[in-house]
Amino acid sequence: MKKWLRTSLIVLTLFIAIGAIGGAIMMRVDPSGEGWGGAPMLDLLRAKMPWPDIFFKDFIPSGYVLLAVNGLPQLLAALLLIKKRYRVAPWVVLACGIILMLWIVLEWWVWGFNPISNLYFVFGLLEAAAAIYWLRDSKR
């Protein structure tokens, strides 16, 4: 494992994890989205996603999904990298990158392209590419 790759992935996974955990907390604290500008996004979610009356009355379910799908897995990836668990870490990083890219594709479908989502797609792509590089390099 190259030190620069490990360090870069620790920084990237922690950055994504902290953002997702912060977003989940924000959605729990202000589930209407009024205080942080998310209310218009809730209307788009209701229009495009299934079961809007169940899952999109407010942002609480979305916050829990954000935490479970992006926040905690990214945090796990960072911890595995920090602890140097090299047998499993690249696989978790790869999964996190793919999951993040799929999440962003869903965001694009609901809200369209925007700079933040585009940037996070690149983050997911970087994670996946780095994990693949790491896995290929470790087989040599």
Regions flagged by a language model, labelled:
Residues K2-R140:
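Topology signature of small-to-medium multi-pass alpha-helical membrane proteins
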